[in-house]
Amino acid sequence: MFETVIGLEVHVQLNTKTKIFCSCATSFGEEPNKNVCPVCLGLPGALPVLNGEAVKKAVSFAKAVNAKVNQNSIFARKNYFYPDLPKAYQISQFEIPIVGKGWLDIEVDGEKRRIGITRAHLEEDAGKNIHEGEISKVDLNRACTPLLEIVSEPDMRNSDEAIAYLKKLHSIVRYLEISDANMQEGSFRCDANVSIRPKGDEKLYTRVEIKNLNSFRFIQKAIEYEVERQIEAWQEGVYAKEVVQETRLFDTDKGVTRSMRGKEESADYRYFPDPDLLPVFIDATLMEEAEKIPELPDEKRARLVRDFGLKEYDAGVIVADLEMARFFETMLSEGASAKGAVTWLTVELLGRLKGESGVQNSPVDAKRLACLVKRIEDETISGKSAKEVLDVLVAEGGEVDAIIERLGLKQVSDDGAILSVIDEVLAQNGDKVAEYKSGKDKLFGFFVGQVMKSAKGVNPAKVNDLLKSRLG
């Protein structure tokens, strides 16, 4: 029996307006090499100047993950050669990062686990290599963009725990609004360090790094494949030969990892303090300002359960995504009940959006969905009719009340009007009334159906109550 050991390195691109060591814009999707300057290009004599906003965002993150802030930290040069690194070194942090040890709690299958965070440090991103046939091009727009690299302890024991940790981290940086964490655009990237060991053995065996994974699904598949590969090598007696310290890439088409290059040790990068940057001192004022963080997912979930009576699961679904949480709370402020808002947001609306990327792109805003929920709750329309209204809202837009009026979906809830229909139905079916009163309770459904058929649009709940009172 084997135990999996997983540690994750997550690169979060901070959403500052300008780069970390120069005033170039950080906007995504510009034409190649538009947002560059002598600092980005590593030209001789160009000196970096630290972006203070990046420091504030790092301190806010530290507060959110229960981590120590090193008020004195330094930047270091990480030396290696790669085409997208024009200086031939990356400005990073080594011995004294801004964020020290911290932790995050995760939950998998109802079991809670604490995952340690070793450190989080600021660094500049590299550029991007673009390969077109036999030609390779370099786009340096991304060079010098601020990154916060978050390094976990090797505390995760399976791919489910790794994904739970990543999703928690993803939510936190979005709630803090320090990053858009857009995985498709590379704002939230993950390197997974994976190894195995016999159960009960505390030794850490050879770890393999899987590089630049940018979707939760691919991260999980890559980890699972790599664990399977290492176990198979151990069982076949070729572990020492097949499992070496290296960097591997995940082939998304074939679902396998393949060797990219040997994995360097920290000594190979020849870190030394960057002589062009002064040590960073975080004073009390900056600490106080940066530590004013918003309500985080765990706190919000506890509040929704406590104050609105939501189930733990439903509250977890709501708070997992910042836009979803905002949508839900807007519905509450517009007068929808918490129970109705959960159902119509997470089941009905999201079920209709399907392939769309979350509620931020929903054609139905929170105010209109709240109005629909209120029309169900004040018995203007039935739940069945509300689904028709939502279909129209998604397809065409419009206002809830106008759609109800146009489709003639308004319920009849007047007791007198419903009673007159009930009396007419009972008078026409005297023999069945006698059978019902003699003990054939199943005939109640027949009477309900006849009333609903005779008077379309009547409130079913009212029909039930009034029928019971008439039949005695």
Swiss-Prot record:
Sorted UniProt keywords: ATP-binding, Ligase, Nucleotide-binding, Protein biosynthesis
**Pfam family for this entry, one:** GatB_N
Tell me which domain of life the UniProt entry assigns to the organism this sequence originates from: Bacteria
Q: What is this protein called?
A: Aspartyl/glutamyl-tRNA(Asn/Gln) amidotransferase subunit B
Q: Which family does it belong to?
A: Belongs to the GatB/GatE family. GatB subfamily.
Documented EC number(s):
6.3.5.-
Which HAMAP family does this chain map to? GatB (MF_00121)
**InterPro entries, from UniProt?**
Asn/Gln-tRNA_amidoTrfase_suB/E (IPR017959), Asn/Gln-tRNA_Trfase_suB/E_cat (IPR006075), Asn/Gln_amidotransferase (IPR018027), Asn/Gln_tRNA_amidoTrase-B-like (IPR003789), GatB (IPR004413), GatB_C_1 (IPR042114), GatB_Yqey_C_2 (IPR023168), Gln-tRNA_amidoTrfase_suB_CS (IPR017958)
What general EC class does the enzyme of this chain belong to? ligase
Which purpose does this protein serve, as stated in its record?
Allows the formation of correctly charged Asn-tRNA(Asn) or Gln-tRNA(Gln) through the transamidation of misacylated Asp-tRNA(Asn) or Glu-tRNA(Gln) in organisms which lack either or both of asparaginyl-tRNA or glutaminyl-tRNA synthetases. The reaction takes place in the presence of glutamine and ATP through an activated phospho-Asp-tRNA(Asn) or phospho-Glu-tRNA(Gln).
The family database entries (SUPFAM superfamilies) matched by this protein are listed as: GatB/YqeY motif (SSF89095), Glutamine synthetase/guanido kinase (SSF55931)
Which NCBIfam families does its entry note?
gatB, PRK05477.1-2, PRK05477.1-4
Description of how the protein assembles with itself and partners? Heterotrimer of A, B and C subunits.
What is the reaction catalyzed? L-glutamyl-tRNA(Gln) + L-glutamine + ATP + H2O = L-glutaminyl-tRNA(Gln) + L-glutamate + ADP + phosphate + H(+); L-aspartyl-tRNA(Asn) + L-glutamine + ATP + H2O = L-asparaginyl-tRNA(Asn) + L-glutamate + ADP + phosphate + 2 H(+)
PANTHER family from the UniProt entry: GLUTAMYL-TRNA GLN AMIDOTRANSFERASE SUBUNIT B MITOCHONDRIAL AND PROKARYOTIC PET112-RELATED, GLUTAMYL-TRNA(GLN) AMIDOTRANSFERASE SUBUNIT B, MITOCHONDRIAL
Biological processes, Gene Ontology terms? glutaminyl-tRNAGln biosynthesis via transamidation; translation
